[in-house]
Amino acid sequence: MGCFSSKHRKTQNDGGGERSIPIIPVQTHIVDQVPDHRKPQIPSPSIPISVRDPETILGKPFEDIRKFYSLGRELGRGGLGITYMCKEIGTGNIYACKSILKRKLISELGREDVKTEIQIMQHLSGQPNVVEIKGSYEDRHSVHLVMELCAGGELFDRIIAQGHYSERAAAGTIKSIVDVVQICHLNGVIHRDLKPENFLFSSKEENAMLKVTDFGLSAFIEEGKIYKDVVGSPYYVAPEVLRQSYGKEIDIWSAGVILYILLCGVPPFWADNEEGVFVEILKCKIDFVREPWPSISDSAKDLVEKMLTEDPKRRITAAQVLEHPWIKGGEAPEKPIDSTVLSRMKQFRAMNKLKKLALKVSAVSLSEEEIKGLKTLFANMDTNRSGTITYEQLQTGLSRLRSRLSETEVQQLVEASDVDGNGTIDYYEFISATMHRYKLHHDEHVHKAFQHLDKDKNGHITRDELESAMKEYGMGDEASIKEVISEVDTDNDGKINFEEFRAMMRCGTTQPKGKQYPFH
């Protein structure tokens, strides 16, 4: 669930009135890391690929990025495209290239978002804590964003790798994050998707700078405007976003959630699905009772509470966070935080990967009754009976079955479904991407997913079985598989039994009745 975000707009209905589009999670732009040996698969000019609107998105002539850069290994893959390492031909300098497939931008809204992302990165160019954009290019098939390569990895990866942690270290981290928030706000930008995955270290050096990336959901601040787009990622979204009336204060809330996780290893709000997380966020009850909170300083808890204040008008500002005694006054102690916090953080990260895999494999075993009308919907869209649907067929289906599927849901399918990046969605990808409707956290569905992964039916998922499934569903590299096994296998026998599997599926999302966190 941590690797999902939503983007929804108010739209006009046929009668001219405004209707709300429901909250439906969709996948964020850049997701799991992939092996070094994978090479870019840029669509060949010889392969005809349909683009709905022949006009350019960036408003400038098409350019072949390969005239200026050689594209190397794949760094990450998301709903809209792929990020590669690239080398500038003229200088030999190394950058990252985010290639966004135009065929996945199914609406004018999506195209505007890409333009806004580029404009915001250009606007913030030169700011030390912001990933620098080098240039943007467009060809018939993709929009390419060339930007600074941050080789130091994600925030949580660095913290976990260090193996030790303190409040003083957490204070330094949150200062860097809120520095970014202040820079954005002073320059008239709301980020709207602050989360640990979007903070990268510039290099592997110990003193490397922490930088913010991914402005795909960001917006320019307009004086007096009340924002209504439901955007962000479930664990980190502010309550006023869910109420569809907010401003720049939402970034402080998200930073507060990150601080809470830094101090205890788990998010402050969880439930058994995304909708349940939203309910808990709206309740806004913060737990400072369970371990390790009794040993966390009062000053740290005071700052968390002020950053997670429900009323945005009363919430602390970025400038006030930076002046808080825990940040500026040296009140954050250097005493190491309990090692279980790092353990929980690792499990929280691994849980997201395993849940994503389980959703995909569960789609295979859903009954006709559980799938309800989705099979018919897929068949109606698959007009040539090829067993797959293209984005154009998906759009046509939207027009023909408007009462059955909203444009937001189609965008969700586009960004979340096409696992192998081949430009089409097969039946099980389609079902998997809509499975949030079917309460698949229930034990019966968890058991079905476990059985699917347990190929030899011996009651355990082995490393080979997990590796096979993760690669089959386009999710696995060696590091990801090793991480999931090590975090789920609580009895250290090298295998995952059903109880371990079920516990991980509920980790970080099911509110415990006792006084224990879901991660131990």
From Swiss-Prot:
<dbReference type="InterPro" id="IPR008271">
    <property type="entry name" value="Ser/Thr_kinase_AS"/>
</dbReference>
<feature type="domain" description="EF-hand 1">
    <location>
        <begin position="369"/>
        <end position="404"/>
    </location>
</feature>
<keyword id="KW-0677">Repeat</keyword>
<feature type="region of interest" description="Autoinhibitory domain">
    <location>
        <begin position="332"/>
        <end position="362"/>
    </location>
</feature>
<feature type="domain" description="EF-hand 3">
    <location>
        <begin position="441"/>
        <end position="476"/>
    </location>
</feature>
<feature type="active site" description="Proton acceptor">
    <location>
        <position position="193"/>
    </location>
</feature>
<keyword id="KW-0723">Serine/threonine-protein kinase</keyword>
<keyword id="KW-0106">Calcium</keyword>
<dbReference type="GO" id="GO:0019903">
    <property type="term" value="F:protein phosphatase binding"/>
</dbReference>
<feature type="binding site">
    <location>
        <position position="458"/>
    </location>
    <ligand>
        <name>Ca(2+) 3</name>
    </ligand>
</feature>
<feature type="binding site">
    <location>
        <position position="422"/>
    </location>
    <ligand>
        <name>Ca(2+) 2</name>
    </ligand>
</feature>
<dbReference type="GO" id="GO:0005524">
    <property type="term" value="F:ATP binding"/>
</dbReference>
<dbReference type="InterPro" id="IPR011992">
    <property type="entry name" value="EF-hand-dom_pair"/>
</dbReference>
<dbReference type="GO" id="GO:0004674">
    <property type="term" value="F:protein serine/threonine kinase activity"/>
</dbReference>
<keyword id="KW-0067">ATP-binding</keyword>
<feature type="region of interest" description="Disordered">
    <location>
        <begin position="1"/>
        <end position="21"/>
    </location>
</feature>
<feature type="binding site">
    <location>
        <position position="393"/>
    </location>
    <ligand>
        <name>Ca(2+) 1</name>
    </ligand>
</feature>
<dbReference type="InterPro" id="IPR050205">
    <property type="entry name" value="CDPK_Ser/Thr_kinases"/>
</dbReference>
<keyword id="KW-0479">Metal-binding</keyword>
<feature type="binding site">
    <location>
        <position position="454"/>
    </location>
    <ligand>
        <name>Ca(2+) 3</name>
    </ligand>
</feature>
<feature type="domain" description="Protein kinase">
    <location>
        <begin position="69"/>
        <end position="327"/>
    </location>
</feature>
<feature type="binding site">
    <location>
        <position position="456"/>
    </location>
    <ligand>
        <name>Ca(2+) 3</name>
    </ligand>
</feature>
<feature type="binding site">
    <location>
        <begin position="75"/>
        <end position="83"/>
    </location>
    <ligand>
        <name>ATP</name>
    </ligand>
</feature>
<feature type="binding site">
    <location>
        <position position="388"/>
    </location>
    <ligand>
        <name>Ca(2+) 1</name>
    </ligand>
</feature>
<feature type="binding site">
    <location>
        <position position="384"/>
    </location>
    <ligand>
        <name>Ca(2+) 1</name>
    </ligand>
</feature>
<dbReference type="InterPro" id="IPR002048">
    <property type="entry name" value="EF_hand_dom"/>
</dbReference>
<feature type="binding site">
    <location>
        <position position="491"/>
    </location>
    <ligand>
        <name>Ca(2+) 4</name>
    </ligand>
</feature>
<keyword id="KW-0519">Myristate</keyword>
<dbReference type="GO" id="GO:0005509">
    <property type="term" value="F:calcium ion binding"/>
</dbReference>
<feature type="binding site">
    <location>
        <position position="386"/>
    </location>
    <ligand>
        <name>Ca(2+) 1</name>
    </ligand>
</feature>
<feature type="binding site">
    <location>
        <position position="460"/>
    </location>
    <ligand>
        <name>Ca(2+) 3</name>
    </ligand>
</feature>
<keyword id="KW-0472">Membrane</keyword>
<dbReference type="InterPro" id="IPR018247">
    <property type="entry name" value="EF_Hand_1_Ca_BS"/>
</dbReference>
<comment type="subunit">
    <text>Interacts with SLAC1 and ABI1.</text>
</comment>
<feature type="binding site">
    <location>
        <position position="98"/>
    </location>
    <ligand>
        <name>ATP</name>
    </ligand>
</feature>
<feature type="binding site">
    <location>
        <position position="424"/>
    </location>
    <ligand>
        <name>Ca(2+) 2</name>
    </ligand>
</feature>
<comment type="similarity">
    <text>Belongs to the protein kinase superfamily. Ser/Thr protein kinase family. CDPK subfamily.</text>
</comment>
<feature type="binding site">
    <location>
        <position position="493"/>
    </location>
    <ligand>
        <name>Ca(2+) 4</name>
    </ligand>
</feature>
<protein>
    <recommendedName>
        <fullName>Calcium-dependent protein kinase 23</fullName>
        <ecNumber>2.7.11.1</ecNumber>
    </recommendedName>
</protein>
<dbReference type="GO" id="GO:0004672">
    <property type="term" value="F:protein kinase activity"/>
</dbReference>
<dbReference type="Pfam" id="PF13499">
    <property type="entry name" value="EF-hand_7"/>
</dbReference>
<keyword id="KW-0418">Kinase</keyword>
